[in-house]
Structures are given as C-alpha cells and as structure tokens.
C-alpha cells in the first residue's frame, strides 16, 4: 500500500527537530532509519500529519565513554552496536542482541533509538535495555529528561516519550565485575521477529551466581524482567541443572500474546527453556 499523505521536514539540528516535532503535536512522528515506522506507514497502521527526519543528525550518532556509563546516540545503528569496541567491552550483550536483528540491510539502517522508541515488545533491544538498567535520554521544548528503562515502556507500542519529545540517547551502565551474558532467541526465520527472546546477565563469584538479570522479549505488551527467575538464580551454583531449575519460574507474571507464531502456553514454555539456556551460557556452565 501507499502511505497516507504527510508533510516532511529534515532539520539540521536537534533543536530544530524538537521545534518541528512540537509544532506537529501528537500527529507528528520522528523517523531515523525507518525500519520500524515505514512498514506501519505503508500498511496505514500509522498515518502522521508530519514526519520529522533526523537521519542527518550526526550529533545523535556514536558511542561515548562517560565514566560509569556509555552514552549511545539514538541514531547509532544496529551494525555500529555490533562492531563498536566500547559496547563490546562494557555491555557486550547489547552487541550480541543487535547482531540477531533481522538481516544485514535492516541492521545497517535500523537504529537503537528507533527500536526503543517504537516500543514493540517483540523487538530484541528493549528487553536488553531493561535487563541492563539503561536510562533513556529525551529532549523536548522543556529541556532534557531521563527515564529509566523500567519506566519507559508503558504498553504495546507505547512509551513514556511525551508529544514533542525526541529520544536523543541511551545511557548504559558499564558492567563491573565478573559478568557473563547471553541473548537467546527463538524465531521462525532469520528475518522474523522473536517469538520469544531472553537477555540474561550473570555475575559470578566462587562458582556461584552472585546476581542475575533477565529481560524477556515478547512475553507481554512490554519488555519484562523475569524477577522470580532472577531471585531463584541468585545464590545458586553456576551449573546447568541449578540454573535450569531457577529458569522454571521465568514465565511468572507474564502475559504473552497468542498468534500464528505461538500460543501463550507455548511462549511460556519457550521462556523457561530459553532462560535456562541463557543463564547457563552466561554463567559459563
């Protein structure tokens, strides 16, 4: 299909982008790589009156070391996340998950900010951001605002970004200590959305799990933390059997969708199995 008619602006600065977006109110949308928004436009599931193209704003691109955190620009592509040395050193699970996104064409165009601002629970990076305890940096006419990833995703395709706000970056805490990680994903084809995905981070100490963080993809209307499984894994031996037992509670508190790709019970089963695998791999078991 052909998208509905809209006005188009391509600002030359973030300030101009904020002004343009504010002028359009709730009927304006931001586009960067377009890998999430363009399909919705073509299907007329989204029909903004104004499209604000931030694809030329280099100030929104790149990775910076800012002490205990990395500041990642919203326009940083999946491909750049995969290959950035700072990301690989300090939050490698983000690179690992980005490498599973769709196909090379999408990874070269799609952006971190677009994936997060789109708010699709089937996307790979929202669950990773939640597991990492990332903070979203938004900018509007009132200035800059920071939003914890745990508070950012409100409902299906709905985030805490207010009308007129642009996601400019993501602050990701550096992993300090003996951390391992794994992103496990089940999908029908390489290009498909995740039926279920699991982002697991494990801090190891003397052969045991000192701390576990688990983010779930496509197990509800938003990305989720598997808090019951996290608690069960903490203090457990870093062995496959012990972590598989901890993973048995990974689906507690979830509300997975049912569709052509999997019934809710099937997704709950996948969450338990993939969590066990991800925890074991992250723990080096």
Residue spans for each PLM region:
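C-terminal structural segment of proteins
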Residues: 1-285
């Amino acid at each position: 299909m052909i998208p509905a008619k809209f006005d188009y602006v391509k600002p030359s600065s973030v300030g101009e982008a904020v002004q343009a977006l504010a002028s359009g109110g709730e009927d304006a949308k931001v586009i960067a790589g377009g890998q999430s928004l363009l399909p919705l436009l073509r299907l007329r599931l989204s029909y903004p009156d104004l499209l604000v193209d931030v694809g030329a704003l280099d100030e929104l691109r790149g990775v910076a070391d800012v002490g205990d955190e990395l500041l990642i620009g919203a326009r940083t592509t999946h491909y750049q996340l995969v290959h950035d040395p700072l990301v690989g050193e300090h939050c490698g699970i983000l690179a690992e998950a980005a490498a599973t996104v769709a196909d090379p064409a999408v990874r070269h165009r799609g952006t971190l900010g677009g994936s997060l601002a789109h708010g699709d629970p089937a996307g790979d990076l929202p669950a990773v951001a939640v597991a990492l305890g990332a903070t979203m940096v938004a900018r509007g006419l009132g200035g800059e605002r920071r939003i914890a990833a745990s508070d950012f995703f409100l409902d299906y395709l709905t985030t805490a970004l207010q009308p007129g706000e642009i996601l400019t970056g993501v602050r990701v805490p550096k992993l300090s200590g003996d951390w391992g990680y794994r992103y496990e994903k089940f999908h029908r084809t390489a290009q498909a959305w995740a039926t279920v995905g699991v982002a697991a981070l494990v801090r190891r100490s003397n052969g045991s799990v000192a701390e576990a963080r688990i983010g779930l993809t496509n197990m509800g209307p938003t990305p989720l933390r598997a808090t019951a499984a996290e608690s069960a894994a903490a203090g457990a031996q870093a062995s496959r059997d012990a972590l598989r037992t901890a993973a048995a509670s990974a689906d507690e508190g979830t509300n997975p969708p049912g569709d052509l790709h999997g019934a809710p019970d099937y997704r709950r089963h996948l969450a338990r199995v993939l969590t066990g695998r991800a925890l074991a791999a992250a723990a080096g078991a």
